Amino acid sequence: MSSAIENWHLCIEKNIVDASFMDQDIEFYSPFVYKPIQGIENVMNYLNAANQVINNKHFKYTDEIVGEGSAFLIFETKIEEIYINGVYYIIWNEEQKLTELRVLIRPFKALTLVAETMSKHL
């Protein structure tokens, strides 16, 4: 069985979002939305939009901290020449399915740009 983190990296590498790696009750904490986004279908909508915006030719991981059931993935990318630095915090269960995903983005100018650009894909 592939690990949750291997599955995540495969999705990023292939620029796809795969619901089979998610628990039915997954929660996504977006930097733009006050309440967590719940359920595979809703989370898929946001991840597909984020994938189109953030996962571009400039996207790269700069660090990774992986534990038994969670990981911090630090990334960098650019949109319209604006530097973006962010963190994915991912939690998974014993079945290697994602149960929680949190995204943090900085600086504020980048956060605003990502929000505006993603809203066009939602």
What function would you assign to each model-found segment?
Residues M1-L122:
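C-terminal and inter-domain tail/linker signature
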